[in-house]
Amino acid sequence: MRDKIKMVSSAGTGHFYTTDKNKRNTPDKLEMKKFDPVVRKHVMYKEAKIK
């Protein structure tokens, strides 16, 4: 089953992306570099739960 997750910027800007992932195939927390438009740079985004 694919669960919805939130990818939060590690730059501390509060910007986030929403996506989904298959928890059976990727049980670990996701980390990926994505563009943060607030600081206009590519920064690490980490997985967080959607409340």
Swiss-Prot record:
Domain of life here? Answer: Bacteria
User: Does the entry feature the keyword Endoplasmic reticulum, yes or no?
Assistant: no
Q: Which UniProt keywords apply?
A: Ribonucleoprotein, Ribosomal protein
Q: Where in the sequence does UniProt note compositional bias of the Basic and acidic residues kind? A: 18-28
One GO cellular component term: cytosolic large ribosomal subunit
Give the similarity note: Belongs to the bacterial ribosomal protein bL33 family.
Identification of the protein by name:
Large ribosomal subunit protein bL33
List the lineage, top down. Answer: Bacteria, Pseudomonadati, Pseudomonadota, Gammaproteobacteria, Oceanospirillales
**The gene coding this protein:** rpmG
